[in-house]
Amino acid sequence: MLYIYIKTQNALVQRINFNLDSQELPQNILWIDLLHPSAAEIAFISSEFNLEFPTKEEREEIELSAKYWEDNATITINAHFLVRDLKNDEEDRNLIKLRTEIVTFATAKNILFTIRYNEFSTFEEIQARILASPKNFEDGFDIIDKMFEVRVEKDADLLEWIDKEARRLRTSVLEKKDEYSYDEMLKDISSLQELNMRVRDSLFDKRRAMTSLLKSDKIDKDIKQNLTIVLKDLNSLVEFSVSQLNILDNIQTILASQINIEQNKIIKIFTVATVAMMPPTLIGTVYGMNFKFMPELELHYAYPIVLGVMVISIILPLVVFKKKGWL
């Protein structure tokens, strides 16, 4: 699908659902958004505007040169967008699952071109802003500027959610030890660490693109000034994500210590039980020997006496352990 945003004579912005077969390209184009484009649509736009869009393989390359490149007429950016899926599991705990989608931005003749294969809330928000406040969007670079600003805000929201969950986990570990399982807690910590690293990678990707845009002579002074402000916010978020990783590592350390304490308690119980059972075991072993000459076996009260000695030999170590504070 091709969505074309054009500037009208009364300084408003109009959105057109463009059809290749029945329409001609309008004048005063601000933005061409290619959503789930067909090969014919990409070929048409490439031919009309003398553009060369990256292939799927080029979009997925990790080299810096594949993320941003610029020539005399165009700028092309392959940016990573995080898509957030919120769903509840069987225990009604909110879990966030992220996936990474690549969006291609290209500029030519002050027109913005975007290629994407999924719906994004960022695009919906930008589209609403353009239609509501068209005077703030004079060309495609204004849209890119606001696009990065909104994306950084979205990443900030994700980091705030991660921070909230990390604090909840810390409270659970310290104050509600009996209300969770260690396996569940470790899984939650691991999930938050993975989310944090994904958001941080997304921030790094935006920082590289914004830094390159600031070096471009195609960007005017006002946009560069706003990008600089957004870049400062982004750097603060990177530092915040690092502090969150440290918090999660701290929670994991506390949890590991608690697991060790629980294991030590179990080992202590088995150790005490083993030591307490050694004397009666020894007594039983002695009197279980098949020697012919064991005169005490002939005594009338031998059996209850031996049982009593065995019970005393169990109780005595337990009393000693209790006084020592080992129980």
From Swiss-Prot:
Keyword rRNA-binding included in the entry's annotation: no
Record-linked InterPro entries: CorA_cytoplasmic_dom (IPR045861), CorA_MIT (IPR050829), CorA_TM1_TM2 (IPR045863), Mg/Co-transport_prot_CorA (IPR004488), MgTranspt_CorA/ZnTranspt_ZntB (IPR002523)
Membrane topology: Multi-pass membrane protein
Location of the motif Probable selectivity filter: 288-290
Localisation: Cell inner membrane
Organism domain of life: Bacteria
GO MF terms held by the record: cobalt ion transmembrane transporter activity; magnesium ion transmembrane transporter activity; nickel cation transmembrane transporter activity
Principal cellular location given in the protein's record: membrane
Site (Essential for ion permeation): N264
Chain ranges passing through the membrane: 269-289, 301-321
Catalytic function, reaction form: Mg(2+)(in) = Mg(2+)(out)
Pfam families: CorA
GO cellular component, one term: plasma membrane
Domain notes: The central ion permeation pathway is formed by the first transmembrane domain from each of the five subunits. Mg(2+) binding strengthens interactions between subunits and leads to the formation of a symmetrical homopentamer surrounding a closed ion permeation pathway. Low Mg(2+) concentrations trigger both a conformation change within each subunit and a loosening of the interactions between subunits. This results in an open ion conduction pathway. In addition, this results in a less symmetrical shape of the whole complex.
Homology family: Belongs to the CorA metal ion transporter (MIT) (TC 1.A.35) family.
Purpose of the protein: Mediates influx of magnesium ions. Alternates between open and closed states. Activated by low cytoplasmic Mg(2+) levels. Inactive when cytoplasmic Mg(2+) levels are high.
The protein's name in its UniProt record: Magnesium transport protein CorA
Lineage: Bacteria, Pseudomonadati, Campylobacterota, Epsilonproteobacteria, Campylobacterales
Designated gene of the protein: corA
